[in-house]
A protein has these predicted regions:
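Transmembrane helix-loop-helix hairpins at membrane boundaries of multipass inner-membrane proteins
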Residues: 1-59, 138-149
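Short hydrophobic alpha-helical membrane-embedded segments
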Residues: 54-63, 253-257
Length: 293
């Protein structure tokens, strides 16, 4: 069952075929609950840290939380993209302003990866939008149902699948799109690292289930072995690197890559038990990672 909140409809969005529609399903309930519980715990755990310009710091943290909540509840692809950026952009400023000595290099790498992923996703979103059926107020629509039923050829679905998957794989991250993560985690302030590792990586996993599986089922079947292979390589590689780390943040980064690889591989098995396991793993991983601090 879905609970929809559609009390706000901006006319400019409506004429683009987009409505500000938020909803909750089983997966959304779990991740919004995790986000709602995690942030107060993070604030309590790091309350002894004296941040310069603390009001701006906590304001950006709360903006990140708002973006995460929106990602997990958006029932419209354009609204989803808006909240995706709303979650990512404050994280960049948190790391670049309040991070460690090498924060500039780390956040530059973070910016390049996330900007590339966002650009690829935006291209895919526009292409999908142009192939949706007309809505009541616009020629095309960004609504979930319209996107799910977009009229695309098999070849089009294949290359758009990769646009979305690379964008989501960068955020998870999945090997070989992971190289931004260890440096960013190490240089970011502890509270930001807790958000990045405990919650934000779930954005990519959630997005694969929410958008890729329903929109590109044939492409998922065609490329599942490639994705599972990359995920398994990432699991083994990251696990071996993690056990050699003497820095907690880098250990968390590499161990998260291994956990996310397991989740991604499970998703692409396309089995019900695999998806159920991913949902449990997402929640438990978030609790465990945040609890480590």
């Amino acid at each position: 069952k879905h609970f929809y909140l559609n009390n706000v409809s901006y006319f400019w969005l409506r004429y683009l075929g987009s409505n500000f529609t938020l909803g909750l399903d089983g997966m959304g309930h779990m991740l919004t609950a995790l986000t709602a519980v995690a942030f107060p715990i993070i604030f309590i755990a790091t309350n002894k840290t004296n941040y310069k310009n603390a009001n701006a710091f906590y304001g950006l943290m709360l903006l990140t939380q708002s973006g995460l909540m929106g990602v997990f509840t958006a029932m419209d692809l354009l609204v989803f993209y808006f909240f995706w950026e709303l979650a990512v952009i404050p994280a960049y400023f948190l790391s670049s302003r309040w991070g460690g000595e090498r924060r500039i290099q780390a956040t530059f790498k973070f910016f390049v990866y996330t900007f590339t992923g966002s650009l690829l996703m935006l291209v895919g979103i526009i292409y999908l939008y142009m192939h949706t059926i007309p809505s009541a107020n616009a020629e095309h629509s960004f609504s979930m149902n319209a996107v799910y039923s977009a009229v695309l050829s098999p070849a089009e679905k294949n290359w758009i699948f990769w646009l979305f998957f690379i964008a989501f794989a960068i955020k998870m991250p999945v090997f070989p799109f992971h190289t931004w993560q260890p440096d960013t985690y190490e240089q970011a302030p502890t509270s930001t690292t807790m958000v990045l590792s405990g919650i934000m990586v779930k954005m990519g996993v959630f997005a694969v289930i929410r958008w890729i599986l329903p929109v590109f089922p044939d492409a998922v079947t065609k490329f599942d072995n490639i994705v599972i292979g990359l995920s398994v390589i990432g699991m083994i590689y990251a696990s071996l690197i993690a056990i050699r780390q003497d820095d907690l943040k880098r250990f968390v980064a590499y161990s998260s890559i291994a956990h996310i690889g397991l989740m991604c591989a499970a998703i692409f098995t396309k089995s019900e038990i695999g998806l159920q396991g991913v949902m449990i793993q997402m929640f438990s991983h978030g609790i465990n990672i945040i609890g480590m601090w």
